[in-house]
Amino acid sequence: MATYPSAKFMECLQYAAFKHRQQRRKDPQETPYVNHVINVSTILSVEACITDEGVLMAALLHDVVEDTDASFEDVEKLFGPDVCGLVREVTDDKSLEKQERKRLQIENAAKSSCRAKLIKLADKLDNLRDLQVNTPTGWTQERRDQYFVWAKKVVDNLRGTNANLELKLDEIFRQRGLL
């Protein structure tokens, strides 16, 4: 029996596309940013076999508060407290310096809920896959290498969440000589 996305999921996808409409990835092709959030949700559904619609919707929205004018209140009003709670868990505090945010991602990864950990794993997997083939505009090779090292530290604190995603991440880390 085929399953179909719910109307709420499609509204969420449309909202994410609208909010990220002016944003581009830092790759040389300047890929529309919305592709990333779609990839994260797709990784969870297809590769991690996640059927929890709240997780899949929060994956679509995982950067919406951090990177657009959307607020947690907007997310809760439109998509409910469950999705909003997950978005809150995976959102960095942009008022902090970048290095502090990165440190907190490592530290807080282990304390996250299992559902938030899934989103973080899929987010890292998509970012690392992109980084394997594209050096972001303005990044040095050293900065790129440092991102892989940092991402491994985050992933190490997310372990035990989803074997499929962890195997795919480990494959990337192995290729980079980090395992």
From Swiss-Prot:
Keywords: Hydrolase, Manganese, Metal-binding. Pfam families: HD_4. SUPFAM superfamilies: HD-domain/PDEase-like (SSF109604). Disruption phenotype: Induces retarded body growth and impaired starvation resistance. Mutants have highly down-regulated DNA and protein synthesis-related genes and up-regulated stress-responsible genes. Its cofactor is Mn(2+). It catalyses: guanosine 3',5'-bis(diphosphate) + H2O = GDP + diphosphate + H(+). The active site is at residues 66-67. Mn(2+) binds at residues 36, 62-63, 123. This is Guanosine-3',5'-bis(diphosphate) 3'-pyrophosphohydrolase MESH1. The gene is Mesh1. ppGpp hydrolyzing enzyme involved in starvation response. InterPro entries: HD/PDEase_dom (IPR003607), HD_domain (IPR006674), MESH1 (IPR052194). The keyword Iron-sulfur does not apply. SMART domains: HDc (SM00471). CDD domains: HDc (cd00077). Belongs to the MESH1 family. GO terms for molecular function: guanosine-3',5'-bis(diphosphate) 3'-diphosphatase activity; metal ion binding.
